[in-house]
Amino acid sequence: AAYLAYNYDFTMLILESLKIIHEEWCKFELIASMGYGPRKYVKGSYLRPHADKPQTHVISSIINIDQDDKHDWPLQIYGYDNEVNEVYLKPGEMFLYEGSKLLHGRTQPYQGTHFVNLFLHYRPNEYHIPKVEVEGAYSYKDLNTETDWIDFSNKNTSERIVGKIF
């Protein structure tokens, strides 16, 4: 189980304040698109491997705010080499990653009492998002098939959006 203590003003302040760090890391201009947290996980929590929303979660970060000192809880993330990497964060540390491209999760149930993270998400200032016409209006295209993802990836992958080694 996870508990969300959302505070819009706080989250937007952090998103805007840390945007420059994310821009320096990925080497292009970003728009702050979404933030979550603080989110508290408790004993038994887990997170299935997933990729985030490509409309808003292109460049992402996780900031560990607090955790039970006795229990680590690694983030598993698949790199561009399809190898699983485990990332361990301590309070005050931040991990940057491409949330909509790299499969990630926490597959081992958490054994501690609490694990608190803040999640920040950005998208490039200039960014192609597939759209489809629905009853005379345009909406974002769902990326459900392998062809959809290949088309999306081909239009948005370049030297400026490749993965960074962590």
Features from the language model and the residues they span:
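Double-stranded beta-helix
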Residues: H114-F166
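A short coil-to-beta-strand element that immediately follows conserved catalytic motifs
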Residues: F28-G37
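Non-heme Fe(II)/2-oxoglutarate
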Residues: A1-C26
